[in-house]
Amino acid sequence: MGTLGKAREAPRKPCHGSRAGPKARLEAKSTNSPLPAQPSLAQITQFRMMVSLGHLAKGASLDDLIDSCIQSFDADGNLCRNNQLLQVMLTMHRIIISSAELLQKVMNLYKDALEKNSPGVCLKICYFVRYWITEFWIMFKMDASLTSTMEEFQDLVKANGEETHCHLIDTTQINSRDWSRKLTQRIKSNTSKKRKVSLLFDHLEPEELSEHLTYLEFKSFRRISFSDYQNYLVNSCVKENPTMERSIALCNGISQWVQLMVLSRPTPQLRAEVFIKFIHVAQKLHQLQNFNTLMAVIGGLCHSSISRLKETSSHVPHEINKVLGEMTELLSSCRNYDNYRRAYGECTHFKIPILGVHLKDLISLYEAMPDYLEDGKVNVQKLLALYNHINELVQLQEMAPPLDANKDLVHLLTLSLDLYYTEDEIYELSYAREPRNHRAPPLTPSKPPVVVDWASGVSPKPDPKTISKHVQRMVDSVFKNYDLDQDGYISQEEFEKIAASFPFSFCVMDKDREGLISRDEITAYFMRASSIYSKLGLGFPHNFQETTYLKPTFCDNCAGFLWGVIKQGYRCKDCGMNCHKQCKDLVVFECKKRIKSPAISTENISSVVPMSTLCPLGTKDLLHAPEEGSFIFQNGEIVDHSEESKDRTIMLLGVSSQKISVRLKRTVAHKSTQTESFPWVGGETTPGHFVLSSPRKSAQGALYVHSPASPCPSPALVRKRAFVKWENKESLIKPKPELHLRLRTYQELEQEINTLKADNDALKIQLKYAQKKIESLQLGKSNHVLAQMDHGDSA
């Protein structure tokens, strides 16, 4: 407010709730100086505009404002006075009246001028409408009611035979191509330096990554028009506002991408390296004055799914934590983002604001000041304050970013930032990386110091054409940079390095040539992995049928037991997934139709399935053949959906191939024995991923073969498991004297006892159900026999 706000006498202060007011007030408090705080540029601009408005600044009727706008033109159509009132009135009139109603009032004035035989007034009215069409023609493209009223006005002018007036209000000059070009034209980047940028995340420098994130952010920010801000004010949400939705979704996507890129690394040291890299990216974003992306990156690093990783934080240097603390303090919401507002106000030239903060300021200003004053006059000060605030954001779109963007990397980031993970899935991955300490009390997710949830859950509307365009450009970029011999294939190793920048589900592809990936396969991969593609429902839905299970079965969605005697749950006829009735609509896994095979040999399994998808050796992963058989996906995956083995895992491919369980496994170890431990459990050999060769092969075949490491971490919820059917399991069991078993701890024994008790209770309940069923059948049989006897006696 300052001295400028006190100098004006109005029922309500015009700057209340605006961004400049709190900033100036806080600066005056912090300086402890008798001198008043220096007014900001926005305050000075608003003061000058109010001086130019004269008596209208204190409030005026709507008719007076319209008449003042019309009288701004001379007989030749030139502006004879300042056009600031025209700008404010034509841009902000929707706060108090619709555009169609405003044009209707102007049309009524034209009728009155015709009745009074005032051709000069009619001509000025047409000049005013021409100015409206020329400067704000996008309103006539987007508002159907305004277009309809405009046609009525044109018919009125034509009916009176005024050819000159008809030419002035002609709307055919509006060219739709100009509007579309403005929204899609390329950003004028700095072309002074040309360089080739690596598409590998590990090879990307923080400066390159920050520049390309800034490019994407500015590309999205500059598409938000003046009318988009007005729609947000009127509706108080981003519904039916696609440009603002995309900007918000990009910010949320960057925050999730940062979390998943950290969590995608299997060891604390590697996670710390990614964490440090993003801190350097944040520093570069600060230098570029890109506060919106800076908020997204720091918000992702401060998220509780990352901050809880104690082992990872132990490998982060003190200097990095100090920088994180400084960035957190800069973006803190304390004192209404006072630190950010100070830093933002000191920035000049190119800068990207935190959109959420300024939109909240707009809403506060819109709600705090009334539309009309006590005497029924329009509150011009409110229109002026809102106009200055929005115009300041729009003017930032005209400043070119001081960077050079590589289009290949832009396509890569465009796809990799488009995520669809939920908070629960991210927390599952975090706890899988570093499980909770059982001795410590469970931690509830706390609000991080930097929050990016002002519009969480916003996602862009899917567009198949846009998806296909980005995917094709991404594939072209990959083959241009990595297919050096131009044979149409890239190696598996190169592709996995590229996929390290994509923290979405990694699907195993059926290669046309062993160890090589074709253009069609990589295109299918990106299309399948795209989050918008998934939201479009282009995947395969499940074909669930109510099923009666004859043996203990667990839900694939929640890992819970399917209770009941008959029709306990639902089973997909295509892929074999089992779930509760209440979980049927909550399944997030895509249905992958199977090709049934009566018999699959071990040779086929080992040749088709990557070693990273084979089940690890463990207590509850006993090797047996399911009764219902396995099936092979068309892309080469082998998945076992029988009731015998159910598991929920996250597959991470990257620096090392790793399979992490994030949900409870089924407690039943084997259909024939639930109390016996597997012979190899407790040995000194570290459990891992193995390929088990069949005894029907030659004796020279290796029993255990370690799976090769994959350098592409990509967290996603997938369910992959292979099995081998043994003809004679006794041949593999060594005599007891040869086993070197370690003593089991008290916690392990207690856990096993609890597991067995739970299994026993479940079996008791099933036994009771079975007994009741038998009793009911016996009773029915007895009644049937008695009925037959009675019928015979009566006969």
Curated annotation (Swiss-Prot):
Subcellular location: Cytoplasm, Cytosol; Cell membrane; Golgi apparatus membrane; Endoplasmic reticulum membrane
Domain Ras-GEF as annotated: residue spans: 205-436
PANTHER family, alphabetized: GUANINE NUCLEOTIDE EXCHANGE FACTOR, RAS GUANYL-RELEASING PROTEIN 1
SMART domains (UniProt xref): C1, EFh, RasGEF, RasGEFN
Compositionally biased spans, kind Basic and acidic residues: 1-12
Signals that turn on the gene: Up-regulated at the double-negative to double-positive transition during thymocyte development. Down-regulated by 12-O-tetradecanoylphorbol-13-acetate (TPA).
UniProt region (Ras exchanger motif region), positions on chain: 57-110
Pfam families given in the database record: C1_1, EF-hand_5, RasGEF, RasGEF_N
Residues that bind Ca(2+): D483, D485, D487, Y489, E494
InterPro entries: C1-like_sf, DAG/PE-bd, EF-hand-dom_pair, EF_Hand_1_Ca_BS, EF_hand_dom, PE/DAG-bd, Ras-like_GEF, Ras-like_Gua-exchang_fac_N
Phenotype upon loss of function: Mice fail to mount anaphylactic allergic reactions and display chronic T-cell immunodeficiencies. Lag (lymphoproliferation-autoimmunity-glomerulonephritis) mice do not express Rasgrp1 and display a systemic lupus erythematosus-like phenotype.
Protein name per its UniProtKB record: RAS guanyl-releasing protein 1
Source species of the chain: Mus musculus
Zinc finger Phorbol-ester/DAG-type: from-to: 541-591
Tissue distribution of the protein: Detected in spleen and thymus. Expressed by mature thymocytes and to a lower extent by bone marrow-derived mast cells (at protein level). Detected in B-cells and keratinocytes (at protein level).
Principal localisation: cytoplasm
Homology family: Belongs to the RASGRP family.
